[in-house]
Regions:
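Conserved glycine-rich acetyl-CoA-binding loop
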Residues: 107-125, 132-134, 139, 145-152, ...
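Acetyl-CoA-dependent GNAT
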Residues: 3, 7, 11-112, 124-125, ...
């Protein structure tokens, strides 16, 4: 049994919104990013419709109570450990690249004490599978250079760096992968 065997991945539900917002803010702060600096959070407040209606998906990863600790946001009898989604690139924010026929990963988060255990990799594999099933053949991702773990995560998962840009005080790193 591997550490991620207890992870259950499923589509996000409206009832998950508060837990997703809590995880999002926690993970950003731990990575050195002020959540107020990240463009909008309207997509999270309007889950799951904000992803589904745009042609994407938002997925949550939960652990049963016995496999989790009380630092994780509660979701009924389970706890939220990971979350993330994808949308067509033309459904993103002004500062993001629009690549015809591609989807962009958004809000990839793993609870800080659980990072480095394979949960992010499992979530990413699920999102890649769902994006491919939805007809996308290219996934793009953008992260702040100061989020070192994310900058290392994407190349380790087969993404290649395709450029850098600036948004406010943040240097952004752009990745893509054919799926």
């Amino acid at each position: 049994m591997t550490v991620t065997d207890d992870l259950q991945l499923r589509r996000c539900r409206s009832a998950d919104v508060e837990a997703v917002l809590e995880l999002d803010e926690w993970a950003l702060r731990e990575a050195g990013t002020d959540p107020a600096d990240v463009p909008g959070s309207g997509d999270l407040r309007e889950l799951p419709a904000s992803y589904r209606e745009a042609g994407g998906a938002f997925v949550v990863g939960t652990l049963p109570e016995a496999a989790a600790d009380d630092r994780l946001p509660a979701l009924g009898e389970s706890h939220l450990v990971a979350a993330g989604g994808f949308r067509p690139t033309d459904a993103g924010y002004e500062d993001e690249r629009a690549v015809e026929g591609a989807a962009e990963l958004h809000r990839m988060r793993v609870a800080p004490p659980y990072q480095g255990r394979g949960y992010g990799r499992r979530l990413l594999s699920e999102l890649e599978w769902r994006a491919r099933a939805a007809g996308f053949r290219l996934l793009v991702a953008t992260t702040a250079a100061r989020q070192r773990s994310a900058v290392a995560f994407y190349p380790a998962a087969g993404y290649r760096e395709v450029g850098r840009s600036t948004y406010g005080d943040y240097e952004l790193v752009h990745f893509e992968k054919e799926i």
